[in-house]
Amino acid sequence: MSKREEVKISEEDLNKQREIINKLREINDAEYERTGKRKKHLTVTYGCQMNEHDSEKLAGILQNIGYIETNDKNEANLIIYNTCCVRENAELKVYGNIGSLKNLKKEKHDLTIAVCGCMMQQPHVVKEIKSKYRHVDLVFGTHNLHKFPELLSTSMESDNMIIDVWDKEGDIVEGLPVTRKYGLKAFINIMFGCNNFCTYCIVPHTRGRERSREVQEIIDEVEELAKNGTKEITLLGQNVNSYGKTLEEETDFGNLLKVLNKIEGIERIRFMTSHPKDLSDSLISAMTVCTKVCAHLHLPFQAGSNDILKAMNRKYTKEAYLELVEKVRSKVPNVALTTDIIVGFPGETEDDFKETLNVVEKARFNSAYTYLYSLRQETPAAKMENHVPDDVKHERFNRLIEAVNRISGEINKAYLNKVVEVLVEGTSKTDDAKLMGRTPQSKLVNFAGNKEDIGQIVRVKITEPKTFSLNGELLK
């Protein structure tokens, strides 16, 4: 565990939560016997895959309590907003959606409204909700998700808003029930928190310091998933390259990949996110020797200017990043690189931005998550001078998007007439008559096929490359 002071979570605490789950289940079962109706919950998730997986845990707890899911807020007895605070836009959406529930709350006296996640770790947000959104029933954060049964029970018995936000991370809690959003694919937390303190980022304040799960706990979870038909796992961490540093047993992320690669039933292993300063030879080696580890590396570079990188506290240079790209490509020739890029960080000049474009041209990413810099309270960047005007940020952003999309389209054109292996995930979102799946490089492929192929790895010949996806024909 981290040397930082933490909240200890005892087995007694966890047993208490299990008892409350059983008690609530009995109450809900009795109500179902009386009315023939199950209570329903709607969970809306904002942000990253870590938040998505947290919502899967909340859904697992609620399923054990006797709730079923709904997508209709008018049907729901419980509405949860699992929030993100990485960018202001996500926060504004949350406030808007919470506000829109005020009239529904007046109409449905049995409706419970809960907000949780990263936004709630910020004191000014909790203060805002207390003063302006008094129809909210329950507020909790990222560190005490295991207490959700108790908090829900207390909230349902109280006329007051229940607020329980821990300002320190606790022990990692294993064994929480999970209702997976996807059958074939599964998210798996291998660690929590971040120690990097990039000057623009709020995550270390909302997710706490780095803590790694024990290797055996991860193995047990993956083996159980494999038994239940999961074919692809995605290992999650704010910085997976730091995995193992807080464990007593000496290990690292590369070794973990090699262990998981041996588990029967799992066909593909993905992971995110990797910090460039911590990308090790051990990880690169694992990508070359582990047959199940996908040839896809998400490696955020954020900015191309060394001055901006220093101001961001990224702890690498443009030159070092490009050398790393070449190193990875030399060892894993078919690797697909994706990245994150921020436009308009405080002090960014036109020359700085051109350095970012230069990295995009040299690294030739398969795709990129591109963002306008968003000021976050409690971060050093918020106090910096020379904030870039919005019109300049948007103009640069559009130029960046053009470059990223052009290169992505060029890379995809090279797939014409190639045969690729696709894990079939389901029907296409754009055409119900077609199937869709992904290559090891995470390329989205649409093709005609039989639904019996869902869950299988099939060979597809690419007949029509597009900028963001590939069309093909199934080979028998």
From Swiss-Prot:
Location within or outside the cell = Cytoplasm
What is the catalytic activity of this protein?
A: N(6)-dimethylallyladenosine(37) in tRNA + (sulfur carrier)-SH + AH2 + 2 S-adenosyl-L-methionine = 2-methylsulfanyl-N(6)-dimethylallyladenosine(37) in tRNA + (sulfur carrier)-H + 5'-deoxyadenosine + L-methionine + A + S-adenosyl-L-homocysteine + 2 H(+)
Q: Which cofactor does it need?
A: [4Fe-4S] cluster
Q: What residue stretches are annotated with the MTTase N-terminal domain?
A: 39-157
Against Pfam families, the record matches this protein to: Radical_SAM, TRAM, UPF0004
Q: Where is the Radical SAM core domain?
A: 180-410
Cofactor remark from the record: Binds 2 [4Fe-4S] clusters. One cluster is coordinated with 3 cysteines and an exchangeable S-adenosyl-L-methionine.
Query: Which Enzyme Commission number(s) are listed?
Result: 2.8.4.3
The protein's GO terms of the molecular function aspect are: 4 iron, 4 sulfur cluster binding; metal ion binding; N6-isopentenyladenosine methylthiotransferase activity
Give a Gene Ontology cellular component term annotated to this protein: cytosol
Name the residues that bind [4Fe-4S] cluster 1.
C48, C84, C118
Ordered alphabetically, the record's keywords are:
4Fe-4S, Cytoplasm, Iron, Iron-sulfur, Metal-binding, S-adenosyl-L-methionine, Transferase, tRNA processing
Keyword flag DNA-binding: no
Query: Which InterPro entries is this protein grouped with?
Result: Elp3/MiaA/NifB-like_rSAM, Methylthiotransferase, Methylthiotransferase_CS, Methylthiotransferase_N, Methylthiotransferase_N_sf, MiaB_methiolase, rSAM, rSAM_horseshoe
Q: Where is the TRAM domain?
A: 413-476
CDD domains in the record, alphabetically?
A: Radical_SAM (cd01335)
Functional summary from the UniProt entry? Catalyzes the methylthiolation of N6-(dimethylallyl)adenosine (i(6)A), leading to the formation of 2-methylthio-N6-(dimethylallyl)adenosine (ms(2)i(6)A) at position 37 in tRNAs that read codons beginning with uridine.
Q: Which family does it belong to?
A: Belongs to the methylthiotransferase family. MiaB subfamily.
UniProt-recorded name of the protein: tRNA-2-methylthio-N(6)-dimethylallyladenosine synthase
- Which species does this protein come from? Alkaliphilus metalliredigens (strain QYMF)
